[in-house]
Each structure stands twice: as structure tokens, then as C-alpha cells.
Amino acid sequence: MSPYEAARGLLSAARGPRRVIRQVAEVSRGLANFSSLLNPSTTASSLNGPIGPHRRWDWARARLGDVKQIRKTHGGTVNDVVLAAITNGFRELLLSRGEPVAGRVIRTLVPVSVRSHEERGSYDNKVSAMFAELPVEIEDPVRRLDALHEQMQHLKHSGQAVAAERLTALGGFAPAMLLALAGRVGTRLPQSAINTVTTNVPGPQQPLYLAGKRMLEAFPFVPLGGQVRVGVAIFSYDGGINFGVTGDLDSSPDIGVLCRGIEDGIAQLLSPAAPSAPTRSERAKPRSRRPSRAT
């Protein structure tokens, strides 16, 4: 850090000492919540390990109207419903691999926006992350959704997401010990502390056109890295919610099970409100004509 940057940080702090004290407090609370994640997961999982150069990609679909109906019927948020469906997908994937799910959770990194209310509508990216635990042990879909909603509400008030963004903003003024701890958290988080990544990107809810042609659907892709063998991205567009699942081809050629599990998770939550929801076998038939892509 240059002397100029240090002076600028001190000047900013001098102009708003109460704000700096408040931000340091927010960082401290957030880092306290990070501490439990520094311990590696006690359960070995096929979701983690060395990854090769090739990928398999597959997808799942849902309707935003169905997700909103589930939210209206059972409570929670759209994001809670999406995470509940993904949880069911991972549950089915693990069971299909013969791995136990009793007493088990899947830790996932969830990127979130940390814009303040006043910053909404701005174009700069202010993104941090929360660490959620997907309760794959819960078989009942409504209980699963309730558990996720309670957890996400707690995480939103825990300061996890605020911590990383505040540390960047404080720059050269935060105590050296706090910055050192934040650096270790941000760059040395053990890969075994997380099992997967789930990123939700809201898209436009009106149709888009190019050269007079309407874009019918858009599917996201999430890259893999470290020891994470499977990642899930979610993109909503024009009344639809599409899931893109990336897997390491060598270790996870079966991510189609995860995709079907995601669709089943939506159908399970929707069925009390819409008993005529398509069955798993009905949805599986067209998928057999659309094999997943290996790269």
C-alpha cells in the first residue's frame, strides 16, 4: 500500500469515525461467523476431490410462476425455494452413488449482492458470499424448505456477506490483525470446507430480441475450480428459471441425476397446490432425447 493510499484511508476515517467503528464491528461479527467454516467437513464426499480438464454440463427447468406459488403456499422466498430444489437434487445424487445422507449437510458457497439500499440501481458489482448448508438429510420437502428459510434468514443477519465487502472498503485503516485474518479467510479457506457452489443470477422478465428474433431461453454455466467437482448456476428469464449444472467429467458423469432431482424438488413442493404437476417419468422422457454435453 502506498503512502498516498494510507493517507487517503486515514482521511476518510477521520471524516467519519463513527462509520468506521460501525464497519469494524460489522466485520468482526462477520468473521466470527466465518470461523466455523474453517474446519473441514467431517464427512468425506465424492463431491470433492481432484478435477480433470473435461466437463459435463446438464440443465433443469422450472417456471417462476410455480416457484412463486410454492412461496405463497409454504412461505419463504424465491431463493429459498430454489435452494430447496437444489438440495433435493444433491440428496438424490448422493443416494444414487450409495452415499449416506443421514445427519448430513452439503456446504455451498452462495454469492450475494452487498449493495446498500441507497446503492440499488448502480452498475458497479458489489458482491460477497455467504456459506449455506443444504440439509440433504431431510426427506420431507416442506420441512426442507422451512429449514433453509430459517437458515438463510439467520445468515442474512449474521454479517457474513458484509464482512468481505467491508474489509475491502476499509483498506489501509483496519487493524493489521483483522486484515491478516480476513486475508486468510478469503484466500486460504480450505477447499474441504465447501462441497459446491450455487449462484443465482436474476435476469430480465421480459423477452429479449436480436435482429428481430426472440431469445427463447438462456442457460447459465458455472466454472469449477479447486476441489469442487459439481457447481450449480441459476438464471431467471421471461417467466422461466433455468438451472445449469457443471460437473467434472471424470468424477461426475451422472449430474443428470442432480438435474432430475432439482425438477422433482419443485414438483414435490408444488403438488399440494397443483396435483396435476408432471411426474418424474413424464419429465424424464424428453430428457432422454437431449443428452448432457461433455467438453
Predicted regions and their residues:
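Soluble acyl-CoA-dependent acyltransferase catalytic core bearing the H(X)4D motif
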Residues: 1-228, 232-295
